[in-house]
Amino acid sequence: MMDEGSVGDVSRIDEADVAHLQFKNSEQSFKPENIEVREVKEVQVQREAGSPDCSYGVIADFLDGKNGGDHVELIGNEPCSSRQNTNDEGDVVEELTVKTCEGSSMAIVGRPSSRARLEMNRSQFLHRFPLDGDLPGSSSMSKKVIDRGTVSILRNAGKMSLPETSNGQLAIIAVNGEANEHLTNVERNPVPVEALSHEGIKTKMLSQSGFSQFFVRKTLKGKGVTFRGPPNNRSKARNMDQQTVASSGSALVIANTSAKISSSIPLAAYDGLPCLPSNTSKPSSCANPSDTHRGCGGEGLSLREWLKSERQEVNKAECMYIFRQIVDHVDCSHSQGVVLCDLRPSSFKIFKENAVKYVVSGSQRESFDSNMNKETLSQLENPLVRRRLGDTSSLSIPAKKQKSSGPSSRQWPMFQRAGGVNIQTENNDGAIQEFHFRSSQPHCSTVACPFTSVSEQLEEKWYASPEELRGDMRSASSNIYSLGILLYELLSQFQCERAREAAMSDIRHRILPPKFLSENPKEAGFCLWLLHPESSCRPSTRDILQSEVVNGIPDLYAEGLSLSIEQEDTESELLQHFLFLSQEKRQKHAGNLMEEIASVEADIEEIVKRRCAIGPPSLEEASSSSPASSVPEMRLIRNINQLESAYFAARIDAHLPEARYRLRPDRDLLRNSDNTVAEVENSETWSSDDRVGAFFDGLCKYARYSKFETRGVLRTSELNNTSNVICSLGFDRDEDYFATAGVSKKIKIYEFNSLFNESVDIHYPAIEMPNRSKLSGVCWNNYIRNYLASSDYDGIVKLWDVTTGQAISHFIEHEKRAWSVDFSEACPTKLASGSDDCSVKLWNINERNCLGTIRNIANVCCVQFSPQSSHLLAFGSSDFRTYCYDLRNLRTPWCILSGHNKAVSYAKFLDNETLVTASTDNTLKLWDLKKTTHGGLSTNACSLTFGGHTNEKNFVGLSTSDGYIACGSETNEVYAYHRSLPMPITSYKFGSIDPISGKEIEEDNNLFVSSVCWRKRSNMVVSASSNGSIKVLQLV
């Protein structure tokens, strides 16, 4: 005897090996009075509340003999509870084989997969459950049992399960007149027809069986579900699906008739029969369920949701374009012989560019085949199939209700939950026809499932055709009717869902709103054509596509596609143009590189020749120069890019020597001077046209110095005081004294050599001259040694006698602060001053009144006389420009230098033809005055831009000497440049003075260098910080 442990011995089988029920009927005719039920114990199985009556009606008809043929009844669809572990997700298949033969006995054995085990189990079962004529020792009868057909019952969740009574006994109803004679040792109780009424079904239970451990231990409950095949046909059935549905318990009723059946019919229990799929070949992509386009171009939006969205107004062109796509899809499906089952908005999704895709599964489609013969259609006359194909399903819907209503029902997750049957029938002619049934998908019916939302039920009702509501099969004309409903809903706009429901109810009676008729007269008539009550009067999809309403719809998506293609073409052309330009640029660059390489090789040869002409250096010179040469080489490598730019710029100028003579005709202003010696020196310096030689000369001067060293420090008692900011520094004619002036309202004269005396703790000025307001600038007279000019914040220009410490003259014609004052080196009696009153005034030391005034459009920040010409004056302005005037013509500037991005704070002459300017845009610019133009901006006159220091808001000082340039920085540093190269030679960082210890520390505390001044007879520069500290720095 088998116990519960035998469950583990039950092997799994796949779909191909599905168990089947085979039997051969006896020669005895089937009559209701021949039905007897052998039982050991009797159980009354009550019908559940809400169970359908149709199941019992079918059974009653069957018992009354109204339907002949083979009958296999699956009683019950109720899910059963089990003591099995419900968390087990594995599939366990248990098979019970019932063997029967004529005039013999009925035996139940185990799995037929093993012949030896089959014999052993059979003998054990017959010994435990002896039947009539099958007593121990009747081997011949046992052999007949094996040789005859077998009845195999597949225990599979969702297909069939054999329930047990409350005491664990297996319930089997045997409807076989001949088999009853072989059942012995049991009580014979015939079952009347009334026993199968709506009140209950009586069953007889076998005695204790080891197989009971394989089945549900619960009293059988449920209804009979009958399949009636056509008479005199041979039938086969096989499993079709592997999908899962809820398991249900069933009692098996086997009825044999007088007709001989050569083959067996395997059985499976269903929650409800599905729609009949198509026998035709698989349709094209437009109807193929594999091409549902889910997530294509994004998840998309359901057309139903799109219709429910708050549309401000109906875009007819957009809606008609959507409608045409759906018609195209339906036409494609109809051309493949497929009728769309769910042709309604919820079955479509709308994507970008209003592209519409059909997204329902393939089981929700039906096919129509005009070539289906009448005999095949007669198979569908079976009541069960006919009900399934109609608009209601009395079997499937209550079955689902039972699943959701039963409080104690549980499923067996280890079993598969869906099934299918493929019925092959063979007529007397030998023709074989095949029907496929699937239960893997919900039935598509006009009566919605309990799990369907109310809106979905309403949508199904709205889009169902009149013939579908009457119970007829769905056809291609039904899809046309649904298209008419869809067209009306697309072109309509509803205030609320209640208004939508009312309008959709009216359209079924062909009632259109007046607003719809007035706005869409042509579409309204077209819509009524599609909604014709008679299906034969409705158009086909081909007629719809060829109609004036649909055929004239612009292909918006195609237009968008064409625009996209045009855009791609434009982008492609643009990319091609870019690549051509890049290629041309690279080729040009390659040509320039070849020219530059040739120039470098030519210059190398020239340098080698010059060195050979000079002669080899002596051993002492070579040994002395080698250790020091490493430092300049490192600096050159660090600045190689800037050096290359300057070198090739010099090469370009060397190849255009005639450009030097394309100069303005009044360039004599640059040399108009009474200082003949200076003019001769300058002519000797610039008489050569060797620009490359000039570059090499500048490179040597740049590499000559590498750093600043401190040579002297001016120590005063007023350090770290903001009132000590020094705005201007200047050496006298002999450079023995220098003057300082600033916010302290004092002009102080210091002896230069005294700064080198380190034994002095505090340096006092040689002379000190007070002023009424803050001082902005000072300038020594280059001819009269003791004359000093100053400018202050009151706009007063004063002439001081340094010997006496008194002011000689006051020039008070400026209306605002005077920023700068300068003496002319060529004419020592002339001086000029610039002011915030946007004017430059010319003075003479022998006269009180102004000699002349230059009016400017912006504030004047600095003034500077040319060192060679007594008539050339330059000044910087806050309008980012530098102006040069011929003092013989004050009405218009001689040239305007434009290139800075901020105010020009300083302007200094390097020589009579070169000017350097400083600006608060962090740059210095070198201007070649020979390249300027008259009456316009001279943007091409800038020959070099220096950068590296910081100057954004303060006056930091500017000074020049023999081609070297010094300036301050807002980082509290002093920078040194040479005119030939744009990068700094070196810089020096000022430190702040500790007020307690008096020592210098690294912190700058937002200090900046406020003024610098070269001592031209040496490579020294005096610089001042904004805290009043003054240092003498020397380039080494």
UniProtKB/Swiss-Prot annotation:
Which ranges of the sequence are coiled-coil? 587-611
Q: Where in the cell is it found?
A: Nucleus
Q: Which GO terms describe its biological process?
A: photomorphogenesis; red, far-red light phototransduction
Identify the Pfam families for this entry: WD40
What do the Gene Ontology cellular component annotations say?
Cul4-RING E3 ubiquitin ligase complex; nucleus
Q: Describe the location of the Protein kinase domain by residue ranges.
A: 200-550
Location of motif DWD box in this chain is 915-930
Q: Which InterPro entries match?
A: G-protein_beta_WD-40_rep, Kinase-like_dom_sf, Prot_kinase_dom, SPA1/2/3/4, WD40/YVTN_repeat-like_dom_sf, WD40_repeat_CS, WD40_repeat_dom_sf, WD40_rpt
Question: Which cystines does this chain contain?
Answer: none
Q: What does this protein do?
A: Involved in suppression of photomorphogenesis in dark-grown seedlings. Probably part of the COP1/SPA E3 ubiquitin-protein ligase complex.
> PANTHER family per the record?
PROTEIN SPA1-RELATED 2
Q: How does it assemble?
A: Interacts with CO and COP1.
Entry protein name: Protein SPA1-RELATED 2
Q: Which organism is it from?
A: Arabidopsis thaliana (Mouse-ear cress)
Q: What is the lineage of its organism?
A: Eukaryota, Viridiplantae, Streptophyta, Embryophyta, Tracheophyta
